[in-house]
């Protein structure tokens, strides 16, 4: 009986355990109408979600996770998505709040979708008068050669026995390479900074930099002196690399000799060679792709010398705010003697802002009182509407977020304006830095130049200008076409990607830019009136045209064979009765007869009237007519005589191609 009872109890225990397991399994099995554990987790989280109408990934329904809205080509391992520029800015589709305005969260969302946020911590520089700055050299800079030529940037003047060799070097390279080759590559330079610059103290947590130098058939000593000066005057901990981009040079000294020479620096200096001539603009974009070690890209022309303590003032603003682009004050290295002097113009301190006229020629205008009021000291960085383009510093990733240079810009010209407008209108800042000085050699007259490759075609610079104004100037582009009417029918390629970039990045209008940043441009270069007519001024039924011969500011115009290429033979007459070429006007000379060309503003030299049907230009103040001597090739005014064929002219439109 005991056996039977024990057996029964054990059987009941087994059955009960089995039934318990069945019940437990049943409770754990999901039913079709049961919410999943993950959905319950989302519900619990959404209770505290400040944006409850957003999806489970924290973004609005249908919104992808953040990806940089930047055109980065995939080159040498640099990850960039060209299609991302087409991505619609999702912030625009956010629900409007009942208050009617954007919340701070919406604003932050838009900014984040446009550019990456600042993550680097950097403290503002501190001015301590009388206490030498922490980046200032404690001892005077040693010379390259004691007592050597050109030390301290003193002029080196060679005798007449070198004249022929100097002229040949200027023709080939644009500089007096005879003198340059006599000067040490490590020469000492003069200090042109304001005294106050010596007492700035900078946070040592500066970003590192890659210095990018593009060259094409550059002279040896001017190129290498650029490199030497950077290495000599840049703290080594911040100099990640120097990247040389050889834009298809064919000079022997820029091949194996260069490769061997840079081995002196054990990999600090690198050279990359383009397989075809790309031009300065696109070669700089290539340089950005090749330079991978530095956090900041510093661009220098291939004939520069950086000055004492140039680095910290230039990079400090970028270390504080990654959307700031900085430009050093550019001094002039004389291409004959290699003396370094401050650039002319500007205000009483030599400070100028970058500007342009409506023909898109580069200009410098004095620093305005408004900009001076924004600074506590005269050596702080100040805002500039534009840069000259050859020398500047920009955070590497920010430059890629901006899309580098417009890939449709060719060789040289206009890229300085394009990057300046893009920075300002899309949320960045462009600052000139008084305490960072860099000397630059300007090409001398007599240089044969570097003609663009055949594949580029004609008028690359003018095409560049047209692309820039079509993308960035909005309604202001009409003023460019008034100044450069020959460009109205010029094909400039596809700019849809660039327009989309503006839209996706919420870039501001050019009107905003002109009113808030470039507010002083029109006071120096007023908006031009509409044209009455434009083109070559040809002697009626002749092959001779009025030609400025490249003269400006008081030179006399002449007659020359018509070439239908515009340039020095392209004029326009506007509704203000000015007969102009670029920013120059025609007027009578001091002798009261010969016609000269000189700089003018809108209130000057309103002297001409063109009677198209009569083929006549009348000089309004004198009542005389425009005349010519086809023997002496002179242009002058004389008493009007309808029977004189030399007073008959025709103005024929010229279109650039």
Swiss-Prot record:
<dbReference type="GO" id="GO:0005975">
    <property type="term" value="P:carbohydrate metabolic process"/>
</dbReference>
<dbReference type="Pfam" id="PF00652">
    <property type="entry name" value="Ricin_B_lectin"/>
</dbReference>
<feature type="region of interest" description="Catalytic subdomain A">
    <location>
        <begin position="206"/>
        <end position="317"/>
    </location>
</feature>
<dbReference type="GO" id="GO:0030246">
    <property type="term" value="F:carbohydrate binding"/>
</dbReference>
<dbReference type="InterPro" id="IPR045885">
    <property type="entry name" value="GalNAc-T"/>
</dbReference>
<keyword id="KW-0328">Glycosyltransferase</keyword>
<feature type="disulfide bond">
    <location>
        <begin position="625"/>
        <end position="640"/>
    </location>
</feature>
<dbReference type="GO" id="GO:0046872">
    <property type="term" value="F:metal ion binding"/>
</dbReference>
<dbReference type="InterPro" id="IPR029044">
    <property type="entry name" value="Nucleotide-diphossugar_trans"/>
</dbReference>
<keyword id="KW-0333">Golgi apparatus</keyword>
<keyword id="KW-0479">Metal-binding</keyword>
<dbReference type="GO" id="GO:0006493">
    <property type="term" value="P:protein O-linked glycosylation"/>
</dbReference>
<comment type="function">
    <text>Glycopeptide transferase involved in O-linked oligosaccharide biosynthesis, which catalyzes the transfer of an N-acetyl-D-galactosamine residue to an already glycosylated peptide. In contrast to other proteins of the family, it does not act as a peptide transferase that transfers GalNAc onto serine or threonine residue on the protein receptor, but instead requires the prior addition of a GalNAc on a peptide before adding additional GalNAc moieties. Some peptide transferase activity is however not excluded, considering that its appropriate peptide substrate may remain unidentified.</text>
</comment>
<dbReference type="GO" id="GO:0016020">
    <property type="term" value="C:membrane"/>
</dbReference>
<keyword id="KW-0735">Signal-anchor</keyword>
<comment type="pathway">
    <text>Protein modification; protein glycosylation.</text>
</comment>
<dbReference type="InterPro" id="IPR001173">
    <property type="entry name" value="Glyco_trans_2-like"/>
</dbReference>
<feature type="topological domain" description="Lumenal">
    <location>
        <begin position="30"/>
        <end position="657"/>
    </location>
</feature>
<feature type="domain" description="Ricin B-type lectin">
    <location>
        <begin position="532"/>
        <end position="652"/>
    </location>
</feature>
<keyword id="KW-0808">Transferase</keyword>
<feature type="region of interest" description="Disordered">
    <location>
        <begin position="31"/>
        <end position="65"/>
    </location>
</feature>
<feature type="disulfide bond">
    <location>
        <begin position="197"/>
        <end position="435"/>
    </location>
</feature>
<feature type="disulfide bond">
    <location>
        <begin position="585"/>
        <end position="600"/>
    </location>
</feature>
<feature type="transmembrane region" description="Helical; Signal-anchor for type II membrane protein">
    <location>
        <begin position="7"/>
        <end position="29"/>
    </location>
</feature>
<dbReference type="GO" id="GO:0016266">
    <property type="term" value="P:O-glycan processing"/>
</dbReference>
<dbReference type="GO" id="GO:0005794">
    <property type="term" value="C:Golgi apparatus"/>
</dbReference>
<keyword id="KW-0472">Membrane</keyword>
<feature type="binding site">
    <location>
        <position position="412"/>
    </location>
    <ligand>
        <name>substrate</name>
    </ligand>
</feature>
<protein>
    <recommendedName>
        <fullName>N-acetylgalactosaminyltransferase 7</fullName>
        <ecNumber>2.4.1.41</ecNumber>
    </recommendedName>
</protein>
<dbReference type="InterPro" id="IPR000772">
    <property type="entry name" value="Ricin_B_lectin"/>
</dbReference>
<dbReference type="GO" id="GO:0000139">
    <property type="term" value="C:Golgi membrane"/>
</dbReference>
<comment type="similarity">
    <text>Belongs to the glycosyltransferase 2 family. GalNAc-T subfamily.</text>
</comment>
<feature type="region of interest" description="Catalytic subdomain B">
    <location>
        <begin position="381"/>
        <end position="443"/>
    </location>
</feature>
<dbReference type="GO" id="GO:0070062">
    <property type="term" value="C:extracellular exosome"/>
</dbReference>
<feature type="binding site">
    <location>
        <position position="277"/>
    </location>
    <ligand>
        <name>substrate</name>
    </ligand>
</feature>
<keyword id="KW-0430">Lectin</keyword>
<feature type="binding site">
    <location>
        <position position="443"/>
    </location>
    <ligand>
        <name>substrate</name>
    </ligand>
</feature>
<dbReference type="InterPro" id="IPR035992">
    <property type="entry name" value="Ricin_B-like_lectins"/>
</dbReference>
<feature type="binding site">
    <location>
        <position position="440"/>
    </location>
    <ligand>
        <name>Mn(2+)</name>
    </ligand>
</feature>
<keyword id="KW-1015">Disulfide bond</keyword>
<feature type="topological domain" description="Cytoplasmic">
    <location>
        <begin position="1"/>
        <end position="6"/>
    </location>
</feature>
<keyword id="KW-1133">Transmembrane helix</keyword>
């Amino acid at each position: 009986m005991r056996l039977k009872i024990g057996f029964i109890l054990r059987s009941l225990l087994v059955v009960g355990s089995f039934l318990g397991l069945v019940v437990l399994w049943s409770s754990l099995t999901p039913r079709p109408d049961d919410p999943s554990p993950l959905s319950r987790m989302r519900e619990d989280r959404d209770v505290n979600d400040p944006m409850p109408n957003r999806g489970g990934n924290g973004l609005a329904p249908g919104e992808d996770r953040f990806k940089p809205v930047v055109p980065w080509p995939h080159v040498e391992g640099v990850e960039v998505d060209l299609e991302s520029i087409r991505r619609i800015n999702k912030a625009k589709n956010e629900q409007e709040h009942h208050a009617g305005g954007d919340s701070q969260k919406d604003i932050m969302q838009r900014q984040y979708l446009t550019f990456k946020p600042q993550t680097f911590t950097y403290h503002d520089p501190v001015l301590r008068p009388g206490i030498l700055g922490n980046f200032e050299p404690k001892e005077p800079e040693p010379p390259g050669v004691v007592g050597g030529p050109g030390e301290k940037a003193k002029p080196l003047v060679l005798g007449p026995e070198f004249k022929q060799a100097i002229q040949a070097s200027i023709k080939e390279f644009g500089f007096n390479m005879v003198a340059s080759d006599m000067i040490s590559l490590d020469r000492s330079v003069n200090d042109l900074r304001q005294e106050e610059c010596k007492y700035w103290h900078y946070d040592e947590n500066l970003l590192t930099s890659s210095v990018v130098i593009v060259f094409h058939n550059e002279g040896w000593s001017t190129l290498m002196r650029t490199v030497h000066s950077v290495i000599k005057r840049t703290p080594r901990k911040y100099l990640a690399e120097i990247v040389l981009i050889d834009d298809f040079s064919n000079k022997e000294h820029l091949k194996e000799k260069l490769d061997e020479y840079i081995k002196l620096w054990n990999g600090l200096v690198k050279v990359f060679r383009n397989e075809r001539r790309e031009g300065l603009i696109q070669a700089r974009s290539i340089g950005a792709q090749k330079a991978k070690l530095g956090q900041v890209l510093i661009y220098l022309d291939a004939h520069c010398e950086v000055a004492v303590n140039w680095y910290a003032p230039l990079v400090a603003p970028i270390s504080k705010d990654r959307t700031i682009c900085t430009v050093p004050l550019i001094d002039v290295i004389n291409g004959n003697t290699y003396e370094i002097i401050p650039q002319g113009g500007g205000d009483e301190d030599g400070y100028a802002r970058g500007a342009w006229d409506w023909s898109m020629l580069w200009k410098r205008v004095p620093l305005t009182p408004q900009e001076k009021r924004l600074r506590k000291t005269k050596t702080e960085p100040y805002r500039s509407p534009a840069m000259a383009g050859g020398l500047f510093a920009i955070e590497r990733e920010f430059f890629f977020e901006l899309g580098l240079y417009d890939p449709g810009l060719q060789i040289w010209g206009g890229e300085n304006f394009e990057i300046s407008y893009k920075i300002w209108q899309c949320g960045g800042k462009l600052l000139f830095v008084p305490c960072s000085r860099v000397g630059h050699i300007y090409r001398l007259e007599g240089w044969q130049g570097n003609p663009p490759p055949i594949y580029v075609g004609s008028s690359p610079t003018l095409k560049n200008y047209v692309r820039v104004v079509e993308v960035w100037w909005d309604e202001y582009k009409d003023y460019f076409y008034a100044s450069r009417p020959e460009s109205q029918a010029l094909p400039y390629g596809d700019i849809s990607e660039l327009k989309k970039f503006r839209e996706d990045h919420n870039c501001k209008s050019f009107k905003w830019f002109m009113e808030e940043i470039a507010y002083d441009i029109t006071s120096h270069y007023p908006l031009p009136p509409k044209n009455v007519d434009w083109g070559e001024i040809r002697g009626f039924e002749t092959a001779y045209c009025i030609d400025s011969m490249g003269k400006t500011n008081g030179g006399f115009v002449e007659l020359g064979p018509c070439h239908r290429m515009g340039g020095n033979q392209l004029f326009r007459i506007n509704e203000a009765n000015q007969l102009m070429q670029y920013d120059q006007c025609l007027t009578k000379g001091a002798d009261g007869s010969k016609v000269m060309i000189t700089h003018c503003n809108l209130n000057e030299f309103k002297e001409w009237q063109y009677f198209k049907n009569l083929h006549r230009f009348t000089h309004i103040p004198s009542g005389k007519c425009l005349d010519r001597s086809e023997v002496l090739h002179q242009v002058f005014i004389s008493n009007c005589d309808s029977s004189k064929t030399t007073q008959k002219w025709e103005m024929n439109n010229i279109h650039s191609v």
